[in-house]
Amino acid sequence: MGGCVGAQHDSSGSLNENSDGTGVALGRNQPLKKEKPKWKSDYPMTDGQLRSKRDEFWDTAPAFEGRKEIWDALKAAAHAFESNDHELAQAIIDGANITLPHGALTECYDELGNRYQLPVYCLAPPINMIEEKSDIETLDIPEPPPNSGHESQLRLRLSTGKDLRLVVRSTDTVFHMKRRLHATEGVEPGSQRWFFSGRPLTDKMKLEELKIPKDYVVQVIVSQPVQTPTPVEN
C-alpha cells in the first residue's frame, strides 16, 4: 500500500514509469474475476468473529497509507463482490480508476501507482466457519466445584470503552467468567466475545489452561448496549 510513486515494478507488470517519473498503474488491468478466494482460518471462526476482524481492518487500513476515497471504493467493491453483485463491483472499480493486475481485489493500484492489498477475509468467509454457540449448547459446560482453584482478578477491557477487574477463580471456564461479568455489568453471556492476544476464547476453555499473564488485558467485544444490573437485596 502506498509508496509506489516513481517506482518500477516490471516483474509484476502492474506498474511502469512514465517519462515524467510518475509511477502509474499500466497494463495488465484485468476485469474482476468472479471466483471467490477459498481460505481456511487458523482457528474455526464464527460470523461475529469474522465481522470483528473485517471491522478492525477497515478501521485501521486507511490510517496508514493510500487515499481514503480509494479505500472507501474498495470497501464498497468488496461488499458487492461478496454479495455476488459482480457488475456493481466492477463499476465501482472502474469509477475509481482502480487497476487490478491479476483481476483480484487482493492487489490493486490507484491511478497514482499507490498499492492497496485486501486480505482474503474481507472478500469471503473461511471454509471452517462455525455457528455461534447457543444457550442450549452451553448447558453442557459443567459447573466448577465451589471454592475450587484460587481466586484472582482478571483485567478486562470492554468494547464500550470501560476497563475493569473481574474477580474470577482459576477453575472458571470462559462461559462462567462471562456469567460473572453479566452479574456485575449486565452484559448477557451470549452478547460477549472474549479475545486473548487476538485469539477468540471459546466458552469451554478454562482460565488455568489459558495461562494469561498477571495484569494482561483481555478484550471483550460487547454486541449490545450494556444494561445497568438490578441491585440484589441482602
From Swiss-Prot:
Protein name per the record: Ubiquitin domain-containing protein 2
UniProt feature, compositional bias: Polar residues: 9-21
Pfam families, sorted: UBD, ubiquitin
Positions of the UniProt region annotated as Disordered: 1-46
CDD domains attached to this UniProt entry: Ubl_UBTD2
Record SUPFAM superfamilies: Ubiquitin-like
Organism this protein belongs to: Mus musculus
One GO term describing the cellular component: cytoplasm
Keywords: Cytoplasm
